[in-house]
């Protein structure tokens, strides 16, 4: 059993039997407490069973005798991150990359955490480390571009996101963010081309349809914009932004106040506190009231 425990464990975990995996590894470690691979696997199973504190103790046991064990460092880092101990998580990820600088997964995990913490400069070093190992890593290009977008370095973001799409043309997140970047740069026609290209592969993505509607609205094509917003709502009628976008086109460009009011009301049914919908409805109602004929006009014509 001990010699084949890895295959047995894989079968148990594949079938969702975490308790079986726990019992298997517990038995192996009772027979051989020095089996480092089994102990690391045990920590991962403890984590999956919702016992992060004991999982952390398990990884610490490994690291006490093997302080450079990359799998244990990664496991501890993920647990620290889960528990909100971000500094220790970063420290463990960093040690893991020092001991195995070619481990792309660790660089990626550390970069994502640093981005989450808005430490964009340090995260960028992670993406660069990955790209030195594999210049065609689409996810690294995407993450790098996403961070550049967040700090409003739109030229850099555009370049990175285009590279992400070059190496993975199916990555809709890269398409959506590239569209946003191009719109920020005022390149609406280019954004529309990207959107149309992405929709060929992701025709059921409501975000792409909504983005297309916003681009068409900016290009002063309200009828086409309305069509795009309706397509987005057919796919997902619960996105507040789309209802507000639709209402804005109906009101500002097509002059259909009643239909616009209905769209804003739909948005507020979903989220009564969505301020864009609240403000739009208030302003629209004020306009409707202002355009009502006075009582004298109604009496005397």
Predicted regions and their residues:
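Residue-level recognition of tetratricopeptide repeat
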Residues: 10, 44, 78, 112, ...
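Terminal, low-structured helical/coil segments at or just beyond the last alpha-helical repeat
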Residues: 1-4, 261, 269-301
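Helix-start (N-cap) detector for alpha-helical repeat units in TPR-like alpha-solenoids
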Residues: 2, 36-37, 70-71, 104-105, ...
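Register position in tetratricopeptide repeats
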Residues: 14, 48-49, 82-83, 116-117, ...
């Amino acid at each position: 059993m001990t010699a084949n425990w890895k295959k047995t464990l894989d079968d148990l975990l594949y079938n969702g039997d975490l308790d079986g995996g726990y019992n298997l590894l517990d038995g192996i470690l009772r027979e051989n407490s020095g089996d480092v691979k089994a102990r690391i696997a045990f920590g991962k199973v403890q984590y999956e069973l919702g016992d992060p504190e004991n999982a952390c103790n398990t990884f610490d046991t490994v690291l006490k005798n093997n302080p450079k064990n990359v799998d244990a460092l990664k496991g501890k880092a993920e647990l620290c991150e889960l528990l909100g101990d971000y500094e220790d998580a970063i420290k463990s990820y960093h040690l893991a990359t020092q001991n195995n600088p070619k481990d792309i997964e660790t660089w990626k995990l550390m970069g994502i955490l640093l981005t989450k913490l808005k430490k964009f400069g340090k995260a960028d070093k992670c993406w660069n480390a990955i790209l030195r190992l594999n210049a065609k890593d689409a996810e690294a290009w995407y993450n790098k571009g996403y961070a550049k977008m967040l700090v409003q370095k739109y030229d850099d973001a555009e370049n990175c996101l285009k590279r992400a799409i070059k190496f993975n043309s199916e990555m809709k997140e890269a398409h959506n963010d590239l569209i946003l970047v191009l719109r920020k740069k005022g390149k609406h026609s280019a954004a529309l081309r990207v959107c149309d290209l992405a929709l060929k592969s992701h025709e059921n993505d409501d975000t792409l349809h909504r983005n297309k509607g916003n681009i068409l609205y900016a290009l002063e094509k309200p009828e086409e914009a309305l069509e795009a917003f309706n397509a987005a709502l057919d796919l997902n009628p619960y996105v507040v932004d789309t209802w507000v976008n639709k209402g804005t086109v109906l009101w500002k460009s097509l002059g259909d106040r009643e239909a616009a009011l209905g769209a804003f009301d739909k948005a507020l049914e979903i989220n009564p506190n969505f301020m864009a919908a609240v403000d739009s409805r208030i302003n629209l109602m004020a306009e409707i009231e202002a355009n009502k004929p006075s009582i004298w006009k109604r009496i005397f014509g």
